């Protein structure tokens, strides 16, 4: 066994699996590699290959968005029936953990919060609470679900908020953890209104 060749195969295979290439015909894949390495005439042009790959990735993404949205809708449906959960007309859901007695922020305000964000499977994607560092941001500079819910929260409140994908990052997702079409869950603690 040539270790370098095998290691390259492992690396490429791992990348393919991580990228969602689950429909690869190994014989055709190896034929493409062989044609390039042996200088043979390819069975399609490089431009055609780019189009095929791009179309495939778009379809993989479309399916992922659809699956994530369906899972999120099912989660919201079940969550909405839990005691203490309020569903707003926008689809945003919240549950009061602690109700504060301070003022409510307005759209032009900047707020200081603690938050803990998870996917519906419980995987943490971001947490100021875990970092031990509050976050400050303008209400107009966050996802729609945050903008909406923070204007309902009195300072001093701590709420569990479930945000449908269209009020979160929508079909674009965010980073590696938040896939397109993801419903998000946050524990949000509104600490202060820090300015306009």
PLM region spans:
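Cross-family detector of peptidyl-prolyl cis-trans isomerase
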Residues: 1-196
């Amino acid at each position: 066994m040539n270790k370098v060749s095998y290691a390259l195969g492992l690396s490429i295979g791992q990348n393919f699996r991580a990228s969602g290439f689950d429909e690869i015909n190994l014989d055709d894949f190896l034929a493409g590699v062989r044609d390039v390495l042996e200088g043979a005439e390819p069975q399609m042009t490089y431009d055609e290959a780019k189009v095929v790959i791009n179309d495939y990735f778009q379809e993989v993404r479309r399916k992922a968005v659809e699956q994530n949205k369906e899972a999120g809708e099912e989660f919201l449906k079940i969550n909405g029936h839990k005691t203490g959960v309020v569903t707003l007309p926008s689809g945003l859901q919240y549950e009061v953990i602690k109700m504060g007695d301070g003022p409510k922020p307005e759209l032009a305000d900047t707020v200081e919060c603690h938050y803990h964000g998870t996917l519906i499977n419980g995987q943490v994607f971001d947490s100021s609470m875990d970092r031990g560092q509050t976050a400050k941001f303008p209400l107009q500079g966050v996802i729609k679900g945050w903008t909406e819910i923070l204007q309902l929260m009195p300072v001093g409140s701590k709420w569990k908020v479930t945000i449908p994908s269209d009020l979160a990052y929508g079909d674009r997702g965010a980073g590696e953890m938040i896939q397109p079409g993801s419903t998000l869950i946050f524990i949000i603690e509104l600490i202060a209104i820090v300015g306009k």
